[in-house]
Amino acid sequence: MTVLANHSFAKMNGIGNEIVIVDLRNTDSQLSAAEARAIAAPGGVPYDQLMVLQKPRMPGTTAFVRIYNNDGSEAGACGNGMRCVAKRVFGESGAQAATFETRAGLLNCWQGPSPDLYTVDMGTPKFGWQDIPLAEEFRDTRYIELQIGPIDAPVLHSPSVVSMGNPHAIFWVDDIEAYDLERLGPLLENHPIFPERANITLAHVVDRNHIRMRTWERGAGLTLACGSAACATAVAAARLKRTDRTVEMSLPGGDLTIEWRESDDHVLMTGAAVLEYEGLFDPDLFAALA
């Protein structure tokens, strides 16, 4: 029987990004992709990302955090999920700062400017075509040659691409609501140019300090919020000189403040995290896996 049967969990959200947190730091158990899918299945606990806390592997870190999408695939980064992890850990320990290890590297988190806000240092963005990664070489990733629709009248074209520990493509549009992202998102996510698939964002620059955006999240689908996409979009806009290095990002689920810090190129994300409820996993969710 899986260790998850009757195991506790916390259902949270980061400005609408649905997060489930499972703490396995007191065991040596590993969570499988099949178990991650079972949790999100009908009758389970719906989520966009599942944050699994494991024993720390490096001195000075609080936990190794594995991040799953609801299709069972693993993600390197999830900014909204890390804010939820920070809220959970800080509430239990009384700490106001912690360092977590993820597949994307070390992430520092701390209490934000008010009790309901948390800041995550998402590290440095990457722009090289091999780092994102892309299937072919592009010397300048501020825009790449990619379009969907007729050649003479493409529906979307020329995205900016950025890695924030996971691949992002940002399409600049005048109206983020004018496109059927549920139809276009999976086509672009799985485009051959993205060998590891990609998160797809539609973004509109309102002014130098404000961007509106919607995201189709790799492995999760249309989402109310994607923190790493907000970071990637803010960085991409600043690279194009369309915004300053600190911007307010308006997502369907709420707002984030993103700062691309000039001193070290780290990207800082500040936003809310909310606990919805706690519970125990129903063993029947995992019966088919026995």
From Swiss-Prot:
Gene Ontology biological process: lysine biosynthetic process via diaminopimelate
Subcellular location(s) per record: Cytoplasm
Keywords associated with the record: Amino-acid biosynthesis, Cytoplasm, Isomerase, Lysine biosynthesis
Protein residues bound to substrate: 17, 49, 69, 79-80, 166, 199, 217-218, 227-228
Pfam families hit by this protein: DAP_epimerase (PF01678)
Active site (UniProt): 78 (proton donor), 226 (proton acceptor)
HAMAP family for this protein: DAP_epimerase
Protein name: Diaminopimelate epimerase
Species this chain originates from: Afipia carboxidovorans (strain ATCC 49405 / DSM 1227 / KCTC 32145 / OM5) (Oligotropha carboxidovorans)
